């Protein structure tokens, strides 16, 4: 059984994430972000999930050192604050984009995102009644006030949404496919396809890791 270690950045959504992973058939172990990097690695995770949480990613305990230790070696999935940490680790600028909390918005898939297996069949602006139309809009739950407007080197944007800062990245992956991040909350009821997205993210990351020969 796939073992996911979830780093808890002290957010109220953490156990919703745990429930979603367990319901999808994954084993999940939770560590607070106050433990050591060594503690996380000693659990022998198949994948590490960096949870949502308050504040800036640089202030979130071990998160940044953990990313430095495992990037490209252990599959990483960042959610909200965890995604911002991945962006920051690649020298992306994480900055205020206007607070939006508890709102479902349609993010717009990029050209790469349209082709990405995580979002296949989830768009709301395409379907059998619209032949030939390429869908790009996927409804997701926003609970954040920080964002990144420009995708940093080493990462590829999969989706964006409009904010006070302009378009910010809502989903991205590293160019080696070993890390992926979602700015939105897939575990929220306001992300209708969220549980499916989570499962697909895990499966995609593990597949990529097997191709890279890290597992």
Q: Each PLM stretch: what is its role?
A:
Residues 3-7, 11-78, 90, 206:
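Flexible gly/pro-rich beta->alpha loop and the following alpha-helix that scaffold active-site loops
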Residues 75-77, 93, 139, 156, ...:
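Proline-centered loop/turn at the N-terminus of a beta-strand
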Residues 80, 144, 185:
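Histidine-centered divalent metal-coordination motifs
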Residues 104-106, 169-171, 181:
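Conserved hydrophobic/aromatic beta-strand scaffold that supports enzyme active sites
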Residues 118-122, 176-177, 181-192:
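Phosphate-binding/catalytic loops
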Residues 115-176:
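Catalytic beta-strand/loop cores that center a nucleophilic Ser/Cys/Thr
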Residues 45-122, 198:
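Cysteine-nucleophile active-site neighborhood
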Residues 189-215:
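Acyltransferase
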């Amino acid at each position: 059984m796939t073992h996911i270690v979830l780093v808890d950045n002290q957010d109220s959504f953490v156990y919703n994430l745990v429930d979603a992973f367990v319901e999808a058939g994954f084993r999940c172990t939770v560590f607070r972000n106050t433990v050591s990097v060594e503690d996380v690695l000693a659990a022998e995770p198949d994948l590490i999930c960096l949870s949502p949480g308050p504040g800036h990613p640089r202030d979130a305990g071990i998160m940044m050192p953990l990313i430095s230790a495992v990037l490209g070696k252990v599959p990483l999935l960042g959610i909200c604050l965890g995604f911002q940490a991945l962006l920051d680790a690649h020298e992306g600028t994480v900055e205020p984009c206007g607070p939006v909390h508890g709102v479902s918005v349609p993010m717009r898939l990029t050209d790469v995102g349209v082709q990405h297996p995580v979002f296949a069949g989830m768009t709301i602006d395409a379907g059998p009644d619209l032949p030939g139309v390429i869908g790009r809009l996927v409804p997701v739950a926003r609970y954040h006030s920080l964002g990144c407007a420009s995708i940093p080197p080493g990462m590829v944007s999969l989706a964006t949404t409009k904010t006070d800062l302009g378009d910010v990245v809502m989903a991205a992956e590293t160019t080696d496919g070993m890390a992926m991040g979602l700015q939105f909350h897939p575990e929220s009821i306001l992300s209708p396809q969220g549980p499916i997205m989570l499962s697909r993210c895990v499966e995609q990351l593990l597949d990529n890791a097997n191709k890279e020969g890290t597992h």
